[in-house]
């Protein structure tokens, strides 16, 4: 990576955790990712969820149809794990190059997760098959029991689900997605080479004070929820250390404005337009720009066993204002950092 003071040239990055939705929303948001990223792991939590090879093939085609001419973008599809999923269907999708990974949502943990897994035991045959064929498991790591505080759900998941699972299936490759706590940062750092993590821009830039002090900021509300500043700092220190099993996963999750700014608002930040510059800002603040390219463009492919991208992009360090909103057919979409001045942006 070359880093003159005002320009960062890096190998084209990938987004290892992305929501593209479907229909008109899909057509609106895809270009914001495809113009920057070479590949993206696409989440399967549609309604109904993507649980078959045929559904994934059809969804992939809808995504590709929304990619503008001149963008070189490959969506990497995932299978939504359910209690009733057939291991043979999963293996077929993996062998045919349709499924790159499978996603574990604890039932009702986040948007469109009501079909999720009720217990690890219920999907053990599927997980055993994944371990056997080398298919990565992507985990939304929160317990969902009503009696457990929302700020404690990730830490409790580690001790009650993640560690027992990894002890039981020692060869299973696991990505602990969108980690938000010091507990998770320490757990991944101390784990073996079969455990990795993604981190979102909002969890590196903000903590729960930013979301709640002086008024509720619904466009910072996501799941897992922002935590206290000691957890934010642990995440920042993990990425700044150059640790090679943590990588870019925006968890960009678009919702129309009226679904965010509501008496019962949806969780998710639409960060695709601003995420890469946000990450660059964090790495610069941590005096760690020398590790920025690996986080964005190398660590993910390395863990997944895929080649790195062979093209490059540039970010420029000049103040730019983020758009207040993006037009949808019958509403607007508010991007992460809407209306704010950002320090780094992708060179057009």
Swiss-Prot record:
Residues bound to Zn(2+) 2: 103, 140, 178
Associated pathway: Pyrimidine metabolism; UMP biosynthesis via de novo pathway; (S)-dihydroorotate from bicarbonate: step 3/3
Active site: 251
Keywords from the named record: Hydrolase, Metal-binding, Pyrimidine biosynthesis, Zinc
A cellular component term, taken from the record's GO annotations: cytosol
Any one of the GO BP annotations: 'de novo' pyrimidine nucleobase biosynthetic process
Keyword Metal-binding appears in the UniProt entry: yes
Source species, domain of life: Bacteria
Names of required cofactors: Zn(2+)
N6-carboxylysine PTM sites in chain numbering: 103
Catalytic activity field: (S)-dihydroorotate + H2O = N-carbamoyl-L-aspartate + H(+)
CDD domains membership: DHOase
Keyword RNA-binding: no
Cofactor mode of binding and number, as noted: Binds 2 Zn(2+) ions per subunit.
E.C. code: 3.5.2.3
Quaternary structure, from the entry: Homodimer.
UniProt cross-references to HAMAP family, sorted A to Z: PyrC_classII (MF_00219)
Family per similarity comment: Belongs to the metallo-dependent hydrolases superfamily. DHOase family. Class II DHOase subfamily.
Stated name of the protein: Dihydroorotase
Annotated source species: Shigella dysenteriae serotype 1 (strain Sd197)
Gene field: pyrC
């Amino acid at each position: 990576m070359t880093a003159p003071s005002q320009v960062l040239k890096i190998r084209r990055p990938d987004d290892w955790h992305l929501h593209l939705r479907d229909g008109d929303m899909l057509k609106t948001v895809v270009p914001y990712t495809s113009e920057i990223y070479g590949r993206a792991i696409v989440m399967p939590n549609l309604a109904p969820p993507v649980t078959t090879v045929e559904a994934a093939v059809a969804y992939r085609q809808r995504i590709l149809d929304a990619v503008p001419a001149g963008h070189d973008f490959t969506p990497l599809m995932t299978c939504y794990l359910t209690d009733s999923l057939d291991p043979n269907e999963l293996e077929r999708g993996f062998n045919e190059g349709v499924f790159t990974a499978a996603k574990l949502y604890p039932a009702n943990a986040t948007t469109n997760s009501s079909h999720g897994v009720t217990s690890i035991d219920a999907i053990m045959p599927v997980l055993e098959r994944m371990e056997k064929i080398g298919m990565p498991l992507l985990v939304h790591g929160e317990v969902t029991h009503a009696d457990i505080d929302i700020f404690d759900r990730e830490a409790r998941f580690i001790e009650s689900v993640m560690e027992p699972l990894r002890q039981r299936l020692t060869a299973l490759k696991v990505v602990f997605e969108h980690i938000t706590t010091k507990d998770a940062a320490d757990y991944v750092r101390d784990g073996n080479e079969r455990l990795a993590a993604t981190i979102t821009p909002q969890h590196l830039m903000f903590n729960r004070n930013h979301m709640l002090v002086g008024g509720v900021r619904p466009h910072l509300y996501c799941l897992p929820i922002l935590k206290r500043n000691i957890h934010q700092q642990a995440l920042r220190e993990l990425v700044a250390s150059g640790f090679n099993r943590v990588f870019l996963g925006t968890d960009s999750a678009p919702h129309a404005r009226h679904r965010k700014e509501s008496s019962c608002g949806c969780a998710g930040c639409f960060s695709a337009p601003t995420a890469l510059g946000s990450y660059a800002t964090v790495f610069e603040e941590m005096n760690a720009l020398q590790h920025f390219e690996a986080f964005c463009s190398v660590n993910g492919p390395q863990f997944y066993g895929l080649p790195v991208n062979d093209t490059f992009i540039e970010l420029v360090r000049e103040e730019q204002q983020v758009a207040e909103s993006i037009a949808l057919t019958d509403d607007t979409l508010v991007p992460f950092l809407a209306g704010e001045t950002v320090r780094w942006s992708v060179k057009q």
